[in-house]
Regions:
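Alpha-helical membrane-protein topology signature
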Residues: 1-182
Length: 182
């Protein structure tokens, strides 16, 4: 389940990359750089806690690819949510360094990840066509596999897959289900 989740996470980036290159999706370089950074923080903290999973590995790899593509094809924005995400990541790093507690870094990174998703929620609500429904559906399926792959239900192991599941569930409702109801 763990490997399947990671593979699906990576595969989901393919239609998203295609949508970016075909100018169907306009990613924010700032948002994707933040997501890539906080996902990297989560990966490092989860590795320290021996809680690493395939989904976060796929997420970090894909997020950095999208961050680079966003520099070429994206539209830079820097709003309050981006600043909250940066602050959350910085707090996580400082807490981890000061206390040696990687779980605090995981918690802060997931708060920052969720805060960073809010502009995407708003965009998905206002204009669902700007997001790739195939990518979001595959990411959601990856989340289901990641949840089943959790071996130990504690913050170190479960918070990241749960956060990703909430984000992807909201996006599937907004860009896959809701447009069919309108």
């Amino acid at each position: 389940m763990n490997a399947v989740s990671g593979i699906l996470m990576l595969v989901a980036f393919l239609p998203y990359v295609r949508a970016i290159v075909n100018h169907q999706t306009v990613p924010s370089p700032v948002t994707w750089a933040i997501w890539a950074s906080v996902d990297t923080l989560a990966l490092l903290a989860m590795k320290k806690e021996k809680a690493l999973n395939g989904q976060i590995i796929g997420a970090v790899t894909g997020a950095w690819i999208i961050a680079v593509l966003a520099l070429v094809f994206g539209k830079p924005t820097m709003g309050s949510i981006e600043w909250v995400s940066i602050a959350g990541a910085m707090v996580g790093i400082v807490l981890w360094q000061r206390t040696g507690n990687a779980v605090l870094a995981i918690i802060c990174s997931q708060i920052a990840t969720f805060a960073g998703a809010i502009p995407t929620f708003v965009g998905g609500y206002q204009n669902p066509a700007q997001e790739d429904p195939v990518a979001w559906t595959i990411w959601f399926i990856s989340c289901i596999f990641a949840l089943f792959a959790i071996k130990k239900w504690n913050l170190a192991n479960a918070l990241q897959p749960l956060t990703f599941t909430v984000i992807n569930t909201v996006m599937v409702v907004l860009v896959v289900i809701r447009p069919h109801l309108l």
